[in-house]
Amino acid sequence: MAHTLAQKILQKHTDQQVGEAGQIVRCRVSMALANDITAPLAIKSFRAMGAGKVFDKDRVALVMDHFTPQKDIDSAIQVKNTREFAAQMGITHYYEGGEAGVEHALLPELGLVGPGDIVVGADSHTCTYGGLGAFATGLGSTDVAGAMALGETWFKVPPSIRVSYRGTMPAHVGAKDLVLQLIGHIGVDGALYKALEFDGPVVDAMSVEGRMTIANMAIEAGGKCGLFPSDDLTLAYTAARGRNDEKLSADQDAVYERSLSFDVSDLAPQIACPHLPENVRPVTEVQGVQIHQAVIGSCTNGRISDLREAAAVLRGRKVHKSVRCIVLPATPGIWKQALREGLIETFMDAGCIVGPATCGPCLGGHMGILADGERAIATTNRNFRGRMGSLESEVYLSNPSVAAASAVAGEIADPRGL
């Protein structure tokens, strides 16, 4: 039978014959991942099941990124326990301190994930790696513990929704706007346990970093994963990171549960308003809403292309006196690249706070918590009530250009009007 991209990747990792959606298959995993919040839970389950070693010390990654640099005693204990486990197991890919970064930016940068891989992570945004053509999905810590021990896990073959993009991308519109538009269209449960498979001329021309931004937010529509075909751009990206991958795409006659098509030519920058990522409106309908904080970073939009986009808006301008603009490059490598390109100086000159490679405020962890009545605009991926601090605060999601323009204006602003 013809296979979707999701089915094709699952088939590569199982001895069963992958059939229609709903089938249960056992698959070998290419990488198992956890972070400083979820690893301690996985380690507890790992020990409870009596596992004595990880299945492959080179195919388990533990990244300390959420509450790091350690924000309090409890987070320090979590990191310490994870560090000791990694040493005991001889895990190669343990990252902390100056080697660590936001996990879903760090692993692609290091060449640890790529096309055709199956990646399971104890973090819901593991789906980011679908931008490289990997079947990547978040699992609970107990299931990740099993994958760490056995090197395999089970999946229910997901049905796939095909999402095609055509047209010409307007100025100040990027990948974030495309995925926000999609979530606004289908809702936060519109792809529940389904694979979102992206294609079309816009995708063909899109950078790998842009693809990862879209794949990152597949989970915000309930998706099991978000998948892009691996092409010349993908292979160039992974080859530069020491990999030797092959192109992979869905069969021409693959059967999809549903097909969607969007013309992006007239798309305006999109804003997800409180308190759901599906509450999406064009910036023209939201501009003028006062903000107190702007966050530029995260596993969604903390890569070098995102920082360039924000810096282009901030260059020669000043952050509004009533706004805290927090910039968090997602990895040390991205930080250094931004430094070399003069972006860090641009941010500092504008009055931004430039911090380390951490998830920080995205999950209300630290380095930018909101008080009662405060509003933030952020390039992050979730805006649930209380996500960035107080239950009485609000978070608006946007692309980096909009976040930067809003930081300057002191209110949600359209960068096309600056």
UniProtKB/Swiss-Prot annotation:
Pathway: Amino-acid biosynthesis; L-leucine biosynthesis; L-leucine from 3-methyl-2-oxobutanoate: step 2/4. Keywords: 4Fe-4S, Amino-acid biosynthesis, Branched-chain amino acid biosynthesis, Iron, Iron-sulfur, Leucine biosynthesis, Lyase, Metal-binding. GO terms for molecular function: 3-isopropylmalate dehydratase activity; 4 iron, 4 sulfur cluster binding; metal ion binding. InterPro entries: Acnase/IPM_dHydase_lsu_aba_1/3, Acoase/IPM_deHydtase_lsu_aba, Aconitase_4Fe-4S_BS, Aconitase_4Fe-4S_dom, HAcnase/IPMdehydase_lsu_prok, Homoacnase/IPMdehydase_lsu, IPM_dehydratase_rel_enz, IPMI_cat. [4Fe-4S] cluster binds at residues 299, 359, 362. Coiled coil: none annotated. It catalyses: (2R,3S)-3-isopropylmalate = (2S)-2-isopropylmalate. Catalyzes the isomerization between 2-isopropylmalate and 3-isopropylmalate, via the formation of 2-isopropylmaleate. Belongs to the aconitase/IPM isomerase family. LeuC type 2 subfamily. PANTHER family: 3-ISOPROPYLMALATE DEHYDRATASE LARGE SUBUNIT 2 (PTHR43822:SF16), HOMOACONITASE, MITOCHONDRIAL-RELATED (PTHR43822). Heterodimer of LeuC and LeuD. This is 3-isopropylmalate dehydratase large subunit. It comes from Oleidesulfovibrio alaskensis (strain ATCC BAA-1058 / DSM 17464 / G20) (Desulfovibrio alaskensis). The gene is leuC.
